[in-house]
Amino acid sequence: MSTSAVITGTGLYTPPEAISNEELVASFNAWVDLHNEAHADEIANGSIEAKTHSSAEFIEKASGIKSRYVINKAGILDPHRMVPDIPERPNTDSSVMCEIACLAANQAI
């Protein structure tokens, strides 16, 4: 008779940081302002349309989402970046997804 390990529970990784719709909209609207300022001439001559501001109410109505958990909140909310700042890792290091999977598996055990 052989013995094998079985994970009988479930684990769910939840990132430690969260972004509210209000925070996301403030960042997005700052990006809109930067974009419109940088492209003022093209907007004025009609070659491109100006971007418009969003609102927390619009996001909630369109998606039903009030807040989201994220990795690297600062990078996402930076209007010059608007994406997580996750440094590239060498192939000898575990990936971010691997770390998340291990954290979830440890919760399940």
Where are these regions (language model features)?
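Conserved "HGTGT" condensation-loop signature of ketosynthase/thiolase-family condensing enzymes
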Residues: 1-109
